């Protein structure tokens, strides 16, 4: 007899998180079929169109022939580690911009991989400044690559990609962008910005489900990764070559159901009006959220000019009876799931604005939020 408990009863929670996030019924339904990992109907009929569409979304028409997309099993962090471990040669040096948990994670990866690198630690609630980055580049002329998180979901900060990209282009530095929580929800033109590698994940702004991440990169940069990998399964060049030469085939077992869901999510992104339209919806969600939370007495962690439309951190109430776990459970009982804080310097919690979320659903959250504030005398 099995000792695995029965699955909990299905509840249609609204996940107000940075991913995994709430998906549409049609994205989930796309997973209700099985695929053979070596069959042409799957690889050439599903994987290859995904690769082409990712390049189309990432670069303007005049740049698209310069770029290619590589899909890789695992979470987004697996793909970040694949890029760092494959793209930085033994005689090259990486500068990591660290202003949150995900910049710090890249530093941890670099140390584990034995990469020559430097870190610019800006603090969790400070935006990186191009002048400070340039000073670091002047001080360390051995730096060849720069890696930065675009949307640092530790705080919800949108880092200054345009300014940093312009600096890298001017100084001949190869730019690696962790766009995990921004690609698909914020317009980015890799060609215009001169980005070498852009990394994201299926379960973020494209609104798919977890299971793989992807890299969009210059073909020349991918070719230069040959022989550099510090890992077999995370060898970016080998994965790219297999997909290029065998019509979308993955080297190792492909997460077929996740890929089918992602293909449907890409279709739904197009139906919504593309990245610009999705960006407007996310921005409207975030504005509705911040205005409504202010009316309830909650203040955002970041100034408005630094805030992304992806996720927002709010200071926790100073009331002695407030406990995040109790607050969370009261919201969950009403069908809403939020995120705990990740900032070491402030007591806060986070609410995501992405996924199958609209301003109307945010307003429903705000009603639930008012009744979940149990430390206020009239909360029910």
UniProtKB/Swiss-Prot annotation:
It comes from the Bacteria. It catalyses: (2-aminoethyl)phosphonate + pyruvate = phosphonoacetaldehyde + L-alanine. InterPro entries: Aminotrans_V_dom (IPR000192), NH2EtPonate_pyrv_transaminase (IPR012703), PyrdxlP-dep_Trfase (IPR015424), PyrdxlP-dep_Trfase_major (IPR015421), PyrdxlP-dep_Trfase_small (IPR015422), SP_NH2Trfase/AEP_transaminase (IPR024169). Keywords: Aminotransferase, Pyridoxal phosphate, Pyruvate, Transferase. The keyword Nucleotide-binding does not apply. GO terms for molecular function: 2-aminoethylphosphonate-pyruvate transaminase activity. Its EC number is 2.6.1.37. The keyword Hydrolase does not apply. It holds the Pfam family Aminotran_5. GO terms for biological process: organic phosphonate catabolic process. Coiled coil: none annotated. Homodimer. Belongs to the class-V pyridoxal-phosphate-dependent aminotransferase family. PhnW subfamily. Involved in phosphonate degradation. This is 2-aminoethylphosphonate--pyruvate transaminase. The lineage of its organism: Bacteria, Pseudomonadati, Pseudomonadota, Gammaproteobacteria, Aeromonadales.
